From Swiss-Prot:
This is Testis-expressed protein 36. InterPro entries: HDNR. Residues 24-39 have a biased composition (Polar residues). Transmembrane segments: none annotated. Residues 1-52 are annotated as: Disordered.
Length: 186
């Protein structure tokens, strides 16, 4: 099938995909020295070595001859099958038990004037909270079956003595008639 108005390639090349017209299949994606991993010209590494400062060459020679005292611990394979390598100087520095603060046997480090009390372990909010016992009327429903029965259980103050009662500052504003409540429950 032909493609486009002005460009009509032959139909025998249908299905072949190239980034540009005229490329052959044998051309690799990239011909740089990094992808082929071979330098194209042998004199390029010598030029790079010539540009390096002389201190770098001296350090490189010293590093080959150096035998570091702590290189014994850097070898992972030598520590593979040994189980006591944490005691042989690796890891964190061990602090003597007398100077440790989290598990100290020194009485003077952790002793203070604090006297333990029964409120230890409680937050300030838990200590200051005062629980008020609510009076629960068991016959009270959200939507009562019969309003008259429930309201008859309460004896209200007469209107005349209302001001007199308020002057005395009563603790209970209404009372429950227990006979009526017990008859409602049964």
């Amino acid at each position: 099938m032909t493609k486009g108005r002005r460009f009509n390639p032959p139909s025998d090349k249908d299905g072949r995909w190239f980034p540009h017209i005229g490329l052959t299949q044998k051309t690799p994606e990239s011909i740089t020295s990094a992808t082929s991993k071979e330098p194209q010209s042998p004199h390029l590494p010598r030029q790079a070595e010539g540009k390096l400062p002389p201190i770098y060459k001296v350090r490189e020679k010293q590093a080959v001859n150096n035998q570091f005292p702590f290189s014994v611990h850097d070898n992972r394979h030598s520590l593979e099958n040994s189980g006591c390598y944490l005691d042989s100087g690796l890891g964190r520095k061990k602090i003597s038990p007398d100077k440790r603060q989290h598990v100290s046997r020194n009485f003077n480090l952790w002793a203070c004037d604090y006297v333990p009390s029964c409120l230890d372990g409680f937050s300030n909010n838990q200590i200051s909270y005062v629980y008020k016992e609510a009076m629960v009327v068991s016959s009270f429903r959200r939507f009562p079956r019969c309003y008259k029965e429930i309201w008859n259980a309460f004896t209200f103050l007469p209107e005349r003595s209302y001001t007199e009662v308020l002057k005395k500052k009563p603790k209970v504003r209404f009372t429950v008639d227990k006979k009526v409540v017990s008859s409602l429950e049964s």
